[in-house]
Amino acid sequence: MQLEQKSSLHCSKCRNFLQKFSQDMQAWNCRELDSPLPSDITLHNLEPARPDSGMSFSTDFDDDFFNLDLHQQERSASFGGVTQYSQQFLREKCSFSPYFHTSLETVDSGRTSLYGSNEQCGQLGGASSNGSTAMLHTPDGSNSHQTSFPSDFRMSESPDDTVSGKKTTTRRNAWGNMSYAELITTAIMASPEKRLTLAQVYEWMVQNVPYFRDKGDSNSSAGWKNSIRHNLSLHSRFMRIQNEGAGKSSWWVINPDAKPGRNPRRTRERSNTIETTTKAQLEKSRRGAKKRIKERALMGSLHSTLNGNSIAGSIQTISHDLYDDDSMQGAFDNVPSSFRPRTQSNLSIPGSSSRVSPAIGSDIYDDLEFPSWVGESVPAIPSDIVDRTDQMRIDATTHIGGVQIKQESKPIKTEPIAPPPSYHELNSVRGSCAQNPLLRNPIVPSTNFKPMPLPGAYGNYQNGGITPINWLSTSNSSPLPGIQSCGIVAAQHTVASSSALPIDLENLTLPDQPLMDTMDVDALIRHELSQAGGQHIHFDL
């Protein structure tokens, strides 16, 4: 609709222009006919008519519509292509044509919206073209002289980079151009002692880097603190030194042997090397040995309470045999003092109360079932008694009531007895014989004599007298009652100690042994069968 209106308007303007042009031509032709032109003047020599040369035009605003130069300048100004000639022509038009000045203001208003100010529109030559080019690169078009840089270009802060103008590939972090490692290095070098703890590195970050100032709380600081710990641990630039105080954090310093520049990550120690594997195994063995020693010490304390500290010596011996290497000596430095050295253990003392004995032929009895009383502690025979068996004598003199009585051996009808075994054979079977309850006490040989009745002590004296036969029978044994009682005691000593001991060993009292109090007959029979080895067993009833 607007296009049709413009077309009709143009048509009316054209008709008016043609009418006025025809009238002007007629008037000009009439004037020229009145004053003919000189013969030396041609149409090529004539200068173009100017509005200020005295020629008057009766034009209005509609005449500017057909000015082609004006339309060309307006079209060029709309696209920013103002040339030096067109700019000069516009200034000349502004000086003498009030109608064209209105149209120029319209063009300037359009350029103002494009470039931002009238001052920028007045620039000539290449400045305007540069401004239009800058507008295409600048999103907001606010500054026509600002040069747009690529997004990955880093604005260098050092003067060397500014002069050289070279492009770097360092990634720009949120806090600046420095990496975590560079920030940590700066923090350590800024400290007076050139060393910082991990907490001090955190504090320096919060105080000196603006990006971390509002991220110092526990919720928002977990990420960057974790990155700092990783950089300290993985980069060879940093080195950890143990703090002198107990329970304090380690110091972090700059490694003087590190290479300058971007340092590679620290290579972790491989745990599968021979040296590290050997050390790890030795340390593990030491810990295991200590643990086993403590457990055995606890068990030994329990057994010692029940059996008279009988297992403590064997624990020390076993622990010494398990780790006999010199490298394992450090594992036993902290062993409790209750463990005695091996030379003082119960195994080396024959007369101790321990049931632990040399394992001579002990494998024979591993599969046998022994009665419950066999496991009880059995006091061993003192070594000095065994060693002094050669001092035993037949003719022994006993002291009874301060009276020295010489014991004479009397012939007793007994069966022939085999000679006793040697000391080494006796010692080899002593462990098995000591466990047999029938062999614990000396066997008293059976005799044919009967104890003689005392005169006046029984029924013969009650009848009022003593018959000659009874008196004779009694008098043959002992003429006096006092002497008879002494003889009975002497006979008992003779039977009990058929082979008398030395005088300093006669009064030795051995511990009482439980004989038949809690005896299991079935277990005893099985034990005797296992000891006999298929031979006949005889029990003396």
Swiss-Prot record:
Tissue distribution of the protein: Isoform b and isoform c are expressed in ectoderm, muscles, intestine and neurons. Isoform b is also expressed in the pharynx. The intestine appears to be the primary site of longevity function.
Gene this protein is translated from: daf-16
Classification via PROSITE patterns: FORK_HEAD_2, FORK_HEAD_3
Example of a GO MF term: RNA polymerase II cis-regulatory region sequence-specific DNA binding
Main location: nucleus
Residue(s) carrying Phosphoserine: S319
Consequence the record notes for mutating S319A: Prevents phosphorylation and results in cytoplasmic localization in unc-43 n498 gain-of-function or tax-6 mutant backgrounds
Protein name: Forkhead box protein O
Source organism (scientific name): Caenorhabditis elegans
GO-annotated cellular components: cytoplasm; cytosol; nucleus
